[in-house]
């Protein structure tokens, strides 16, 4: 079980994250190649990695140069850009989750629908590069779980496309809902919206580092050079002790007996889009012998209030209950394997270093079935036969 622990003692930003992943050993070509798979004019930006130091700590610095004149981009445009690219499914999924959390926060702050969220022209390219680069690097490393230290709040003001705003910026503050913070770091912006979105979307645990054997350390430098502490984020990569990974989640439940069942499927889709780890309906019999369903949502602890509010907004429920739970999980990662139908994404499940089973990835098989006008069952059989060997 491969774990990545983000030591954010000075904060986190998108470029710091990519830089730390590169310092951890991810080839620069992995990040550059992923960005090149997006429909962005290659002449409109350039990427580079440099060696630098902050307060005597050697670190990598990820530099993105962007032309000033860029087209207006809304969240819907960026989401379509990622989905229609040739990126691996695992990279797409991570990037979409991060951008959704970022756009959701911006939508709430500015009071607009999420599809109409507008990213500042130059900042949009920066965010796209940082988010897709992070997703590609994590996929290349085969990270199973991301954990992070509590985040420094920072203080003061920051200059943005919307003017001078308090630290943390409003979108960052929204993304910090449910995440642990502290005020020990000094003044200035310590957590950027992109950095907060990465952890809000991907981190499954916050606090002390989980028990693991460290196999790599990476340091990523931020743009600024703070007076008080080195502006560096450290990443610790390691193997969890034993074959199982333990993490903490929140279970959200409610009973529904008076709602049009046609809407229930939409509710599940909204929950998964919002970052729920899982969601399901189960049948039950309620008072007055009413047939009903129980909605169960598995969420990261920091998502509790957000997802509970979504349930109350999207269903006829007038209350929810929630409680913490612990999980034990097997390691799983996505791989592309060759088949007679072309490269297909499969899920490889491991117990420690031993492969337990290999299962076809539903979305990849569904796409092949549609493209080749085959039944999904037939595609599954072929993939299981040709790519399902451990």
Curated annotation (Swiss-Prot):
Keyword field contains Cell division: no
Gene Ontology molecular function: lyase activity; nickel cation binding
Biological classification of the source: Bacteria, Pseudomonadati, Thermodesulfobacteriota, Desulfuromonadia, Geobacterales
Family: Belongs to the LarC family.
Keywords noted in UniProt: Nickel
Pfam name, any one: Ni_insertion
Protein name stated in the entry: Putative nickel insertion protein
InterPro entries: Ni_insertion (IPR002822)
PANTHER family (UniProt xref): NICKEL INSERTION PROTEIN-RELATED, PYRIDINIUM-3,5-BISTHIOCARBOXYLIC ACID MONONUCLEOTIDE NICKEL INSERTION PROTEIN
Annotated TM spans: none
Domain of life: Bacteria
Signal peptide: none
